[in-house]
Amino acid sequence: MNIIEQKFYDSKAFFNTQQTKDISFRKEQLKKLSKAIKSYESDILEALYTDLGKNKVEAYATEIGITLKSIKNARKELKNWTKTKNVDTPLYLFPTKSYIKKEPYGTVLIIAPFNYPFQLVFEPLIGAIAAGNTAIIKPSELTPNVARVIKRLINETFDANYIEVIEGGIEETQTLIHLPFDYVFFTGSENVGKIVYQAASENLVPVTLEMGGKSPVIVDETANIKVASERICFGKFTNAGQTCVAPDYILVHESVKDDLITALSKTLREFYGQNIQQSPDYGRIVNLKHYHRLTSLLNSAQMNIVFGGHSDEDERYIEPTLLDHVTSDSAIMQEEIFGPILPILTYQSLDEAIAFIHQRPKPLSLYLFSEDENATQRVINELSFGGGAINDTLMHLANPKLPFGGVGASGMGRYHGKYSFDTFTHEKSYIFKSTRLELGVHLPPYKGKFKYIKAFFKN
C-alpha cells in the first residue's frame, strides 16, 4: 500500500468514528477554517500574485472574500440544512410516518484547477465539511505556491485523517481517482473530466464535474453599448481570461458591431492604461504551455486583430486582444480559449444567433446584453446553458442562493451555498410504522381483499 492509499484508508477510518456527523463538530471546523484563512491572508495573496500575477484586490474578491462569505453562510444555515424532513405518507401506508434524513457520503475527493486555485479548493470543501464528510484535496500543480500555502493551512488547522492535502501531478491524480471514494468533485477541463468520470465509474463513485466550454455573449441592437463593453471586459479579462465562465466569444448584431469594438477598445484603456503590460491590475498566463497554446491561436488570427495582440514570453504576458471578422470555422472557434483573446462574430437576426449557439455544445454560461424583453425571454427559454446573466457577466456566481454548474459537455452537478451541502449529502429515506395496528390488507391470504386493494389505489 502506497502513502496515498494509506491516507485514503486513514480518512475512511476517521469518518467511521462518527465524529463528523455531529453538527456542533461541523460548525466548529468551519469556524476554524475561517480563522485560518484570515491568518493566512497575506501568504495567500502573495502566492496568487506569484503564480498568476493577480492584483490583491482581484485576488481577495474572487478567492478569499467570497470563500469567507461562504463559510459564514454555511455556519448560519447549517442547522436548517441538516434537519430530518417529515414528508407526507399515503393513506394506504397507514399507520406509517415517512422521513428523509441528511447524511454525509463519507470520504470525498476534491480536485481543483489552477485558475482560481484557492477558491475552487475551499468552496467545495465548505460543502463537504458542512455535510459531515472527511476529505482529501488535490490542488493544482500548476500553481505550486498556492498549493503549498493550502497544504500548510490545512495541516495546521485539521487532523490529517480528517482533511488531507495531496500535492503532485498526473501520477498522484491517477492514483487518487482510482480509489473507491464515496464522492468525487472535479473542476477542470473537459478532457480531464472524462478521465476522472471513467475512473470513478470503475467503483460506481458519484461525481460532480465542473468544466467549461465556449460561453457566448449576445449583444443585440438595443443593448447599452457602454455598459456592455465595461461588463464584458471585466468578465473576459479578469484573471487574464483564465475563468471557466468568462465570455469566450461575442455574437453582436451587425448594426452595432463597430460601436461595440470602439467601446471595448476604450474600456480596455480605461481599465489597464496605455501600457497594459505595466498595469498592476492585469494578470499573467499560468505557465508556458498555456502561453504557447494561446500565442499559437493568436498567430493563426493575425489578420483579425483590431486591438492588442502583443505578448511577452518572459512574463507569460498576453495583451487583451479583440478579433474581428471571425467565422465559425476559424481556429479560435474550435476550442475553449481560456485566455485574454476575444473573437467577435456578427448576426443579422436573433433567430440566427440562437441557431448558432444551438449547433454547439451546451455552454457553462451565457450572457445577453439587451433592453428587449422579448429577446431576453427567447434566449432564456430557447437556449440551454449552465447559468448566466442578462446585462452582466460572471456575477451570477456571487449569489450563494443560486446553484452553479454545467449542463451537457460543460459539466454535471451543482454547488454553492446550500447546493454545496446538498452535493455532498445523501438523502436517506425511511419509514416508521407503528406496531399497535396492522390492517393486513396487503398480507396473504388474499381471498376477499381485491376490492380493498383497488379502493386503496383508486385514482
Specify the residue positions occupied by each region the protein language model found:
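N-terminal Rossmann-like NAD(P)+-binding subdomain of aldehyde/semialdehyde dehydrogenases
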Residues: 1-99
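Structural signal for hydrophobic packing residues in well-ordered secondary-structure cores
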Residues: 15, 19, 34-37, 41, ...
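Conserved C-terminal structural/oligomerization subdomain of aldehyde/semialdehyde dehydrogenase
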Residues: 21-25, 218, 317-459
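Rossmann-like NAD(P) dinucleotide-binding subdomain of oxidoreductase/dehydrogenase enzymes
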Residues: 91-227
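ALDH superfamily catalytic-core signature
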Residues: 191-327, 390, 448, 455-458
